Design a protein with these regions (language model features):
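Oxyanion-binding and handling regions
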Residues: 1-23, 35-38, 92-215
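Short amphipathic
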Residues: 25-29
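Generic structural marker for isolated residues within well-ordered, non-membrane alpha-helices
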Residues: 44, 80, 159
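Phosphate/pyrophosphate-binding loops at sites that engage ATP/ADP/AMP, CoA/4′-phosphopantetheine
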Residues: 44-60, 146-151
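DPxDG-like acidic metal-binding loop motif
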Residues: 60-91
Length: 215
Protein backbone atom coordinates (compact mmCIF):
# COMPACT_ATOMS: atom_id res chain seq x y z
CA UNK A 1 0.00 0.00 0.00
CA UNK A 2 1.26 3.47 -0.88
CA UNK A 3 2.02 6.13 1.70
CA UNK A 4 -0.04 9.28 1.24
CA UNK A 5 -1.39 12.38 2.95
CA UNK A 6 -4.85 13.52 1.87
CA UNK A 7 -7.10 16.40 2.90
CA UNK A 8 -10.69 17.42 2.28
CA UNK A 9 -11.23 21.11 3.02
CA UNK A 10 -14.06 21.68 0.55
CA UNK A 11 -16.89 21.55 3.08
CA UNK A 12 -17.68 22.74 6.61
CA UNK A 13 -15.86 19.73 7.97
CA UNK A 14 -12.14 18.99 7.82
CA UNK A 15 -10.83 15.52 7.02
CA UNK A 16 -7.16 14.60 6.93
CA UNK A 17 -6.00 11.04 6.29
CA UNK A 18 -2.42 9.79 6.51
CA UNK A 19 -1.64 6.30 5.28
CA UNK A 20 1.80 5.11 6.35
CA UNK A 21 3.20 1.58 6.21
CA UNK A 22 -0.28 0.13 5.76
CA UNK A 23 -1.88 1.94 8.70
CA UNK A 24 -4.31 4.85 8.54
CA UNK A 25 -4.18 7.88 10.80
CA UNK A 26 -7.29 10.04 10.67
CA UNK A 27 -8.46 13.41 11.91
CA UNK A 28 -12.05 14.46 11.36
CA UNK A 29 -13.63 17.70 12.60
CA UNK A 30 -17.36 18.01 11.89
CA UNK A 31 -17.56 21.81 12.04
CA UNK A 32 -14.43 23.55 10.84
CA UNK A 33 -16.08 26.34 8.86
CA UNK A 34 -13.77 29.29 8.24
CA UNK A 35 -10.89 27.62 10.14
CA UNK A 36 -9.41 25.30 7.54
CA UNK A 37 -6.39 27.55 6.96
CA UNK A 38 -5.57 27.55 10.67
CA UNK A 39 -6.30 23.88 11.33
CA UNK A 40 -4.96 21.98 8.31
CA UNK A 41 -1.19 22.28 8.83
CA UNK A 42 -1.24 21.55 12.59
CA UNK A 43 -3.44 18.50 11.98
CA UNK A 44 -1.17 17.19 9.21
CA UNK A 45 1.88 17.73 11.41
CA UNK A 46 0.23 15.93 14.32
CA UNK A 47 -0.65 12.90 12.21
CA UNK A 48 2.87 12.71 10.77
CA UNK A 49 4.35 12.78 14.27
CA UNK A 50 1.87 10.18 15.51
CA UNK A 51 2.88 7.86 12.67
CA UNK A 52 6.58 8.64 12.93
CA UNK A 53 6.53 9.65 9.28
CA UNK A 54 7.85 12.54 7.22
CA UNK A 55 6.55 14.31 4.13
CA UNK A 56 9.45 12.95 2.08
CA UNK A 57 8.23 9.40 2.75
CA UNK A 58 4.87 10.03 1.11
CA UNK A 59 4.30 8.55 -2.34
CA UNK A 60 1.70 11.18 -3.18
CA UNK A 61 -0.55 13.88 -1.78
CA UNK A 62 -4.28 14.27 -2.40
CA UNK A 63 -6.79 17.08 -2.09
CA UNK A 64 -10.45 17.65 -2.88
CA UNK A 65 -10.74 20.23 -5.66
CA UNK A 66 -14.51 20.75 -5.43
CA UNK A 67 -17.33 21.16 -5.50
CA UNK A 68 -17.79 23.04 -2.25
CA UNK A 69 -16.52 26.09 -0.42
CA UNK A 70 -14.50 28.33 -2.74
CA UNK A 71 -12.10 29.32 0.05
CA UNK A 72 -11.77 25.80 1.41
CA UNK A 73 -11.00 24.41 -2.04
CA UNK A 74 -8.19 26.93 -2.53
CA UNK A 75 -6.67 26.08 0.85
CA UNK A 76 -6.58 22.36 0.11
CA UNK A 77 -5.10 22.84 -3.34
CA UNK A 78 -2.43 25.27 -2.16
CA UNK A 79 -1.38 22.92 0.63
CA UNK A 80 -1.14 19.86 -1.63
CA UNK A 81 0.82 21.82 -4.24
CA UNK A 82 3.17 23.08 -1.54
CA UNK A 83 3.83 19.56 -0.29
CA UNK A 84 4.36 18.39 -3.87
CA UNK A 85 6.80 21.18 -4.63
CA UNK A 86 8.77 20.49 -1.46
CA UNK A 87 9.07 16.74 -2.03
CA UNK A 88 8.77 16.24 -5.78
CA UNK A 89 5.86 13.82 -5.22
CA UNK A 90 2.68 13.94 -7.35
CA UNK A 91 -0.78 15.20 -6.44
CA UNK A 92 -3.99 13.19 -6.78
CA UNK A 93 -6.91 15.60 -7.36
CA UNK A 94 -10.25 14.30 -6.06
CA UNK A 95 -13.80 15.59 -6.33
CA UNK A 96 -16.44 15.67 -3.64
CA UNK A 97 -18.64 13.73 -6.05
CA UNK A 98 -16.22 10.84 -6.45
CA UNK A 99 -15.90 10.64 -2.68
CA UNK A 100 -19.68 10.52 -2.26
CA UNK A 101 -19.98 7.81 -4.91
CA UNK A 102 -17.08 5.66 -3.72
CA UNK A 103 -17.77 1.94 -3.48
CA UNK A 104 -20.98 2.47 -5.41
CA UNK A 105 -20.47 0.00 -8.23
CA UNK A 106 -23.74 -1.56 -9.31
CA UNK A 107 -25.78 1.46 -8.22
CA UNK A 108 -26.92 4.61 -9.97
CA UNK A 109 -25.78 7.49 -7.76
CA UNK A 110 -26.52 11.20 -7.70
CA UNK A 111 -23.76 12.78 -5.61
CA UNK A 112 -24.74 16.06 -3.95
CA UNK A 113 -23.07 19.00 -2.22
CA UNK A 114 -24.97 21.86 -0.59
CA UNK A 115 -24.77 25.02 -2.72
CA UNK A 116 -27.05 26.96 -0.32
CA UNK A 117 -30.27 28.80 -1.11
CA UNK A 118 -32.07 25.54 -1.94
CA UNK A 119 -29.59 24.63 -4.67
CA UNK A 120 -27.09 21.80 -4.94
CA UNK A 121 -23.93 20.89 -6.78
CA UNK A 122 -24.52 17.49 -8.34
CA UNK A 123 -22.90 14.81 -10.44
CA UNK A 124 -24.50 11.52 -11.47
CA UNK A 125 -22.88 8.14 -12.06
CA UNK A 126 -24.24 4.96 -13.63
CA UNK A 127 -23.73 1.43 -12.31
CA UNK A 128 -20.21 1.27 -13.76
CA UNK A 129 -19.08 4.60 -12.31
CA UNK A 130 -19.34 6.57 -15.55
CA UNK A 131 -20.74 10.10 -15.36
CA UNK A 132 -24.28 10.49 -16.64
CA UNK A 133 -24.51 14.09 -15.45
CA UNK A 134 -21.37 16.25 -15.39
CA UNK A 135 -20.83 18.51 -12.37
CA UNK A 136 -23.88 20.78 -12.35
CA UNK A 137 -25.82 23.34 -10.30
CA UNK A 138 -29.36 22.03 -9.79
CA UNK A 139 -32.53 22.40 -7.75
CA UNK A 140 -34.95 20.02 -6.09
CA UNK A 141 -36.96 19.46 -9.26
CA UNK A 142 -33.92 18.05 -11.04
CA UNK A 143 -33.08 15.90 -8.01
CA UNK A 144 -36.59 14.45 -8.08
CA UNK A 145 -36.18 13.45 -11.71
CA UNK A 146 -33.07 11.46 -10.87
CA UNK A 147 -34.76 9.83 -7.87
CA UNK A 148 -37.67 8.80 -10.09
CA UNK A 149 -35.15 7.31 -12.49
CA UNK A 150 -33.76 5.04 -9.78
CA UNK A 151 -30.78 7.05 -8.59
CA UNK A 152 -29.60 6.88 -4.97
CA UNK A 153 -28.71 10.21 -3.35
CA UNK A 154 -25.35 10.37 -1.63
CA UNK A 155 -23.23 13.07 -0.01
CA UNK A 156 -20.19 13.50 2.21
CA UNK A 157 -22.08 16.32 3.93
CA UNK A 158 -25.06 16.44 6.23
CA UNK A 159 -27.64 18.03 3.91
CA UNK A 160 -29.82 19.60 6.57
CA UNK A 161 -31.89 21.64 4.11
CA UNK A 162 -32.79 18.72 1.87
CA UNK A 163 -36.56 18.06 2.16
CA UNK A 164 -37.69 14.97 4.07
CA UNK A 165 -39.16 13.49 0.89
CA UNK A 166 -35.59 12.80 -0.24
CA UNK A 167 -33.52 10.10 1.42
CA UNK A 168 -29.82 10.89 1.14
CA UNK A 169 -27.09 8.52 2.29
CA UNK A 170 -24.22 10.26 4.04
CA UNK A 171 -20.95 8.43 3.52
CA UNK A 172 -18.24 8.59 6.19
CA UNK A 173 -15.94 11.39 4.95
CA UNK A 174 -12.67 9.91 6.22
CA UNK A 175 -13.42 6.45 4.83
CA UNK A 176 -14.53 7.90 1.50
CA UNK A 177 -11.33 9.97 1.27
CA UNK A 178 -9.05 7.05 2.11
CA UNK A 179 -10.79 4.50 -0.11
CA UNK A 180 -10.90 6.94 -3.03
CA UNK A 181 -7.18 7.65 -2.68
CA UNK A 182 -6.30 3.98 -2.64
CA UNK A 183 -8.49 3.09 -5.60
CA UNK A 184 -7.81 6.07 -7.86
CA UNK A 185 -4.05 6.11 -7.18
CA UNK A 186 -3.80 2.75 -8.96
CA UNK A 187 -4.17 4.57 -12.30
CA UNK A 188 -1.23 6.93 -13.03
CA UNK A 189 -3.44 9.00 -15.35
CA UNK A 190 -5.44 10.23 -12.33
CA UNK A 191 -2.47 12.23 -11.04
CA UNK A 192 -1.87 15.78 -12.21
CA UNK A 193 -2.24 19.48 -11.54
CA UNK A 194 -5.03 20.08 -9.01
CA UNK A 195 -7.44 22.55 -10.63
CA UNK A 196 -10.33 23.99 -8.66
CA UNK A 197 -13.75 22.72 -9.72
CA UNK A 198 -15.94 25.82 -9.59
CA UNK A 199 -19.38 24.98 -10.96
CA UNK A 200 -20.68 28.51 -10.60
CA UNK A 201 -19.17 31.90 -9.90
CA UNK A 202 -18.53 32.92 -6.32
CA UNK A 203 -20.83 35.46 -4.71
CA UNK A 204 -18.00 38.00 -4.73
CA UNK A 205 -17.43 37.54 -8.47
CA UNK A 206 -21.14 37.87 -9.19
CA UNK A 207 -21.38 41.08 -7.16
CA UNK A 208 -18.34 42.57 -8.92
CA UNK A 209 -19.86 41.83 -12.32
CA UNK A 210 -23.19 43.33 -11.29
CA UNK A 211 -21.49 46.51 -10.07
CA UNK A 212 -19.45 46.76 -13.27
CA UNK A 213 -22.56 46.30 -15.42
CA UNK A 214 -24.39 49.01 -13.48
CA UNK A 215 -21.75 51.64 -14.24
Amino acid sequence: MKNYLAADTASKYLTVVLSYNGKRYVCYEEDCAMRHSAELMPVADRLLKEAGASLSEMDFFACVVGAGSFTGIRIGIATAKGFSLATGKPVLPLTSFRLAAYNGEGKKILALCDALHGKYYACAFDETGLETLPPSYIGQEEILRFVNDGYILRSTERLENLPDRFSCERVTPSEALAESCEKLSEDPSNFGEPIALYIRKSQAETEREQKAAAK
